Amino acid sequence: MSETKNIDEIAGRLSKDIFKHFLWTTHPKTDDNFECANEKHVGEGGKPKATHPGDVVFYYRDPYLGKTVYLHTDLKSYAKDTITSTRLRGAFKSLCMAIDCARCSDSWRAKYSVDDGEAHEVRGLLFVHNHDNGYDKPFYEAVDKVNLQALPVAPGTQLHYLGPHDIQRLYSIANDILRLKGEGELPSTYTFYYPDLVMTRRQGDVWDQSATIETLTAPYIIIKHRATEEQSAGYVIYYNAPASSPEEFEYFLDSLSRFQML
């Protein structure tokens, strides 16, 4: 097996190790292509694309939308010097075309076991792992240099991305969840907390809610758990904001009070 293949597999294993703790489901079919149905989609050299790649599909129920979100994911594993705007532009362009086809493709739905009658959305996720752990720049600066307006994003399409620092942070949280469960401080069953919003109410059972992709990049992640023989019911909160001013914490505490958590 080549070194490149080994590096690519690291990203696959890492993504599964992370997202299972956020209660995402991984479709068993991985590293598979599906048929391109748009003659306007062209690859390198201007040749029409025959297929689109699919590294892995994650999915979860969105409690605000009341539907299942499928994340057609492109797993990238780059060395620190190869995380460039040019390379990211190519990855985003490929993912844009893949999602454009996936959203209306019968073969994609059949491949990933999506019922035609199921309320769902298909989105793209670009997962960029730095395998030599040397990338110390803000990933968002590289993304900002990509001319997103020039990408072939179809109307209604949503793309998400996680960079090296996002992945390190989420891996750390996943390991902490694993540790808390192992030490009996967090029950094996838990849920991610979603308050009713002013314009949007949460739908479905409050328990076994997954962390949405928006939650994973939000200022904080809240886990809610029931009481056990050793532990009272409560919350675990992971904070993901700069923590640079007193006003920031005042707003955070006001939010917790508004959620009736204090």
Regions found by a protein language model. Give the residues of each.
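Intrinsically disordered, low-complexity Ser/Thr/Pro/Gly-rich regulatory segments
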Residues: 1-54, 58-262
